[in-house]
């Protein structure tokens, strides 16, 4: 440009204001962090609390800013030792204070320049210039106030300087000025009031220009309501008309910011209050609106006390002091209720706005101003509440507790989301607006200017050209717009045209200023939507009010009608990083961590609340399902039978038991059940959880639905285990069928959650139910598989071994036997077909496999004991094996055998366990046949078509597959695996094989002893014996098959040998005359038939060759005849 160097337009006011304002925020951030660090014992510089330096610190503070190092060696001796560390660790603090001093110098220099240039300020005309000027004044004032609040400032500066003096022999060059500044600004406002006397006119002019903006922004809710503020539907005919104003940027200017300008501005240029009624009016209005102002973040300034303390000492200010006291009373009495009503209005206004824009996003173009006004108004009210609730000066706190604050924040977030989502819609609208209307109007205005210097003309022509060149195609092509240069040029132009000697005075061309302010707003709608959202709706201040933030969240969750808005709190955590500044990078990590921890906590609490509601619903549904269990209809059946036989057993007046389903009958629609309330609360909370799929917080992605999924998995796991009602002391456990009913009820409720939240509940089922099929879950806790396995092994089967329970093949169940001590459970209710199928449904193939393996482990321990007994009798058994055709010799050898009863007892236990396993396997097969019939039939085909010449390893693999599907196999793979692990290193394979052969011999020759047992009587009704010896058939076949598979022997040959020995031994008792010995001879004979029937390797023809069939037939006749006579 061609102007002289000394001209005011060359002072670069725009650039300096921009840079100093940004630097001021950075300095505030650093000073704030120093204040907080000094206030926290953990973060405080260690030298300030070091006992060894205490006397030195006190001395330095007392003498500050003077430096005396010569005569105080004793007090400063410790300082001498640590001088290098002090220099190193306090440098950041010291030079921050130096930076504040330099910032103060630059601000004072700029303020003097502005005064010298006699700059014209009017917020409605040169908005950017006036705003930046007022911002600078307030930032400067705030910085000096915050500095004065650091109690340790003298100690830090003094310590550093003394360490510098001791190290370098002289004070730091900045220290004299810095020390003097600290002393001068002990009472910063008083000092600044003197300092601002020369700047009074400029500052008061700028402030008084707010009379066109502040009073109409600071209205009551009733006035807003009457004006139908922010309503798009109040005048449908104008809905598509662009929202216009002569003061566009003032419409969304923060009320909080204006109040700070007015309060601090008129404290600094207080003379205007006495001379200008407009100034006094603004001052009073601001004092009546709040009791405290936000200095920076959570640092507040109590307006009335500070102003009164300053004015009370000024002569002739009694009237102003009285004004302050009156305004304070008014603020305490009415401000709370006024702001409460405003928040109430804004809730409904923002809801309407968000709803209309969601339906018609195209309205974001013409009505963008309404959106940013709404956001700004709501943000101001929320910040006001947050600040005042934390600094209440009134006994009644009702006005400062807003349980509906979440709703207001939610609608703000909804509007923000609309702006982000439909940004291209707004860009498209305003690109056309700028090129088709703004450029034309501005061009006309420029053409009609009477005087327009060359420089100003060039700038304005560039504006017109920039706007004219815009097209919709640029938006469609995704071109990135950048109008920052244009906005800075307008800022410069404001500075050039607002000085007193300007050829083109903006004060004389207000229309130009207003038009350009509108154009600047339109450019921001194209390239700065994100920045606009931060400017109008940033709520990062919540980061510094953690306790209030958490309290608001808890209140939101406690109120069912507000829980749908609880997602607002995690969403606010996304704002936190916007409060950081590049001049203080070290706080980014701290604020980032706080945002992450708060977001995590909020989402976790929301998920927990939803989980608890779901659990309550599940509990109710489980109770309702329980009412439908067959056991509950016994009383109804009994009453029906009695009624039919005309027996009156019930007492008169006995209330009739409610039938299931009564809860669904409503007398009227106003009746609300507990379940209704739970469903309503859940749907509200789930709306919140489902509101956003994910959110970004400090480069971390949070997915609210995953929190719910995780909590549901944990709770479902605990609930399933809890519903087993396993009591280790009393050994009580829920029946599998009842547990299955409860689990299905629980799963039905969980499936219904998919109607509320888009979560994959099938994944939850798969994760949880698959874990329940294992011994332990992912947290190392016992599962229903381990609980039921332990119960069946340690409780049910142990009582079978003790003779209290018998296996009834006819019923395919274990049944209690009459004993002196009644059992606490009915075995049939846990082991019949329906219960075993329910168990299979619950445990699945994996769980049933674990159950089988546990059973096999018990069998293997019994076989190990049997082998020991065989080893003890190995010589006798070897002889008996080859002497079965010598009756006398066999009798003599038999008498030499030991532990015969123990062998039979252990083999019976093995048989019982195998019988239980066959029940479980059969149930598993039935269940899988329903679920996967085609797969089961394929496995069955595999098993049934194994060629005889197939390698045993291949056959065992097929058997393992078949066993996993619940199919019976010739050789039990699980039993083979269990017995294989018993191989002893000290015994050769040949010896092991011999022991296995002799074990079968031992069992065969021991069988006749069973006939003498009273309990060995066969019962046709149960198709077995009460002492479970019928289970020997299964034990003998399965053990033989497993052992001779392991030792690669012929199973068929060994079983033939067993049959020969057993039949020979049993035929002998036919010749016995002792009735005691032959008491249940016929019942024992039947065991041979059972063994052959059970075996895939033996045939009836083979039995016929060893044991006359006529004996078997007679035995059956005898036992049936005996059972008829005993029952008669």
Swiss-Prot record:
The chain crosses the membrane at residues 995-1015. It is a single-pass membrane protein. The keyword Membrane applies. Its main location: membrane. GO terms for cellular component: lamellipodium membrane; SCAR complex. GO terms for biological process: cell migration; cell morphogenesis; cell projection assembly; cortical actin cytoskeleton organization; neuron projection morphogenesis. Residues 651-665 have a biased composition (Basic and acidic residues). It is found in: Cell membrane; Cell projection, Lamellipodium membrane. Residues 640-665 are annotated as: Disordered. Keywords: Cell membrane, Cell projection, Membrane, Transmembrane, Transmembrane helix. The keyword Transcription does not apply. PANTHER family: NCK-ASSOCIATED PROTEIN 1 (PTHR12093:SF11). Belongs to the HEM-1/HEM-2 family. Part of the WAVE complex that regulates lamellipodia formation. The WAVE complex regulates actin filament reorganization via its interaction with the Arp2/3 complex. Actin remodeling activity is regulated by RAC1. Plays a role in neural tube closure. This is Nck-associated protein 1. It comes from Danio rerio.
């Amino acid at each position: 440009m061609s102007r002289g160097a000394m001209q005011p337009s060359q002072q670069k006011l725009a650039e300096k204001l921009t840079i100093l304002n940004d630097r001021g925020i950075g300095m505030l951030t650093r000073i704030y962090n120093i204040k907080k660090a000094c206030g926290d014992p953990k973060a405080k510089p260690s030298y300030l609390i070091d006992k060894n330096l205490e006397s030195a610190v006190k001395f330095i503070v007392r003498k500050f800013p003077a430096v005396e190092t010569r005569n105080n060696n004793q007090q400063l001796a410790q300082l001498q030792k640590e001088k290098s560390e002090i220099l190193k660790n306090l440098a950041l603090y010291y030079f921050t204070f130096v930076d504040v001093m330099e910032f103060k110098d630059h601000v004072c220099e700029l303020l003097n320049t502005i005064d010298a240039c006699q700059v014209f300020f009017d917020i409605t005309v040169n908005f950017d210039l006036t705003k930046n000027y007022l911002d600078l004044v307030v930032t400067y004032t705030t910085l000096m106030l915050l500095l004065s609040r650091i109690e340790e400032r003298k100690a830090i500066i003094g310590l550093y300087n003394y360490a510098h003096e001791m190290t370098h022999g002289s004070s730091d060059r900045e220290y004299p000025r810095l020390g003097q500044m600290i002393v001068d600004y002990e009472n910063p406002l008083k000092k600044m009031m003197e300092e601002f006397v020369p700047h009074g006119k400029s500052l008061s002019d700028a402030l008084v220009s707010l009379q066109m903006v502040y009073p109409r922004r600071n209205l009551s809710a009733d006035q807003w309501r009457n004006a139908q503020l922010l309503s798009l539907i109040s005048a449908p005919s104008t809905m598509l008309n662009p929202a216009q104003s002569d003061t566009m940027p003032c419409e969304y200017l923060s009320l909080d910011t204006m109040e700070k300008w007015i309060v601090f501005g008129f404290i600094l240029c207080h003379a205007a209050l006495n001379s200008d009624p407009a100034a006094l009016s603004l001052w009073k209005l601001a004092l009546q609106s709040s009791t405290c102002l936000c200095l920076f973040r959570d640092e507040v300034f109590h307006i009335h006390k500070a102003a009164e303390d300053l004015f009370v000492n000024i002569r002739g200010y009694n009237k102003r002091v009285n004004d302050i006291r009156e305004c304070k009373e008014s603020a305490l009495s009415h401000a709370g209720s006024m702001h409460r009503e405003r928040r109430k209005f804004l809730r409904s206004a923002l809801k309407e706005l968000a709803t209309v824009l969601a339906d018609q996003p195209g309205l974001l173009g013409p009505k963008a101003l309404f959106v940013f006004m709404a956001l700004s108004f709501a943000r101001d009210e929320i910040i006001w509440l947050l600040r005042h609730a934390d600094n209440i000066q009134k006994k009644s706190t009702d006005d400062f507790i807003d349980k509906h604050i979440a709703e207001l924040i939610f609608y703000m977030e909804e509007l923000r989301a609309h702006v982000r989502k439909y940004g291209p819609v707004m860009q498209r609208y305003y690109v056309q607006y700028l090129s088709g209307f703004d450029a034309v109007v501005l061009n006309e205005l420029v053409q009609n200017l009477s005087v327009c210097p060359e420089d100003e003309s060039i700038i304005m022509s560039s504006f017109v050209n920039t706007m004219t060149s815009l097209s919709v195609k640029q938006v469609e092509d995704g071109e990135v717009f950048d109008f920052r240069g244009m906005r800075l040029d307008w800022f410069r132009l404001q500075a050039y045209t607002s000085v007193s000697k300007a050829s083109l005075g903006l004060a004389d061309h207000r229309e130009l200023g207003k038009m350009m302010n509108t154009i600047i707003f339109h450019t921001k709608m194209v390239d700065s939507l994100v920045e606009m959202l931060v400017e109008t709706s940033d709520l990062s201040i919540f980061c510094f009010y953690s306790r209030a933030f958490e309290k608001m969240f808890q209140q939101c969750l406690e109120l069912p009608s507000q829980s749908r808005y609880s997602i607002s709190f995690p969403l606010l955590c996304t704002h936190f990083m916007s409060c950081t500044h590049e001049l203080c990078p070290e706080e980014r990590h701290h604020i980032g961590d706080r945002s992450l921890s708060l977001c995590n906590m909020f989402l976790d609490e929301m998920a927990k609340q939803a989980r608890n509601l779901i659990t309550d619903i599940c509990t109710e549904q489980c109770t309702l399902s329980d009412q439908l269990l067959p056991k509950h209809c016994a009383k109804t059946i009994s009453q029906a039978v009695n009624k039919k036989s005309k027996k009156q057993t019930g007492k008169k007046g006995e209330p009739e038991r409610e039938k299931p389903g009564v809860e669904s009958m409503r007398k009227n629609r106003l009746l609300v059940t507990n379940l209704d309330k739970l469903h309503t609360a859940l749907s509200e909370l789930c709306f919140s959880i489902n509101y956003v799929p994910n959110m970004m917080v400090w480069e971390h992605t949070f997915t609210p639905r995953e929190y719910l999924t995780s909590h549901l998995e944990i709770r479902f796991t605990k609930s399933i285990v809890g519903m087993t009602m396993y009591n280790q002391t009393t050994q009580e456990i829920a029946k599998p069928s009842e547990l299955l009913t409860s689990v299905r009820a629980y799963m039905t409720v969980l499936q219904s959650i998919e109607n509320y939240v888009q979560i994959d509940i099938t994944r939850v089922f798969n994760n949880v139910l698959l874990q329940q099929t294992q011994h332990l879950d992912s947290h190392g806790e016992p599962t229903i598989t381990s609980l039921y396995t332990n119960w069946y092994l340690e409780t049910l089967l142990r009582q079978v071994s003790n003779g209290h329970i018998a296996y009834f093949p006819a019923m395919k169940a274990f049944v209690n036997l009459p004993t002196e001590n009644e059992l606490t459970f009915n075995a049939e209710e846990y082991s019949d077909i329906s219960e075993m199928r329910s168990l299979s449904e619950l445990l699945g193939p994996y769980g049933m496999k674990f159950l089988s393996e546990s059973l096999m482990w018990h069998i293997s321990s019994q076989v190990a004991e049997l082998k020991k007994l065989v080893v003890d009798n190995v010589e006798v058994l070897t002889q008996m094996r080859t002497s079965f055709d010598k009756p006398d010799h066999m009798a003599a050898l038999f008498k030499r055998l030991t532990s015969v009863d123990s062998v039979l007892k252990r083999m019976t236990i093995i048989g019982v366990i195998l019988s239980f396993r066959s029940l479980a396997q059969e149930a598993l097969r039935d269940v899988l046949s329903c679920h996967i019939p085609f797969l089961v039939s394929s496995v069955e085909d595999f098993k049934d078509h194994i060629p005889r010449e197939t390698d045993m390893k291949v056959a065992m693999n097929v058997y393992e597959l078949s066993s996993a599907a619940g199919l019976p196999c010739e050789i039990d793979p699980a039993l083979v695996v269990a017995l294989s692990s018993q191989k002893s290193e000290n015994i050769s394979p040949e010896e092991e094989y011999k022991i296995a052969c002799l074990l079968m011999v031992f069992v065969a020759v021991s069988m006749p002893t069973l006939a003498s047992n009273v309990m060995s009587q066969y019962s046709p009704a149960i198709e077995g014996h009460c002492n479970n010896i019928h289970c020997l058939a299964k034990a003998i076949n399965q053990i033989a098959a497993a052992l001779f598979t392991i030792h690669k022997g012929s199973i068929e040959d060994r079983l033939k040998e067993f049959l020969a020995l057993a039949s020979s031994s049993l035929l002998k008792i036919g010749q016995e005359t002792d009735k005691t010995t032959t008491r249940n001879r016929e019942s024992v004979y039947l065991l041979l038939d059972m063994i052959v029937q059970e075996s895939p390797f033996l045939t009836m023809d083979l039995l016929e060759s060893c044991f006359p069939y006529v004996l078997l037939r007679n035995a059956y006749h005898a036992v049936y005849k005996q059972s008829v006579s005993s029952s008669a």
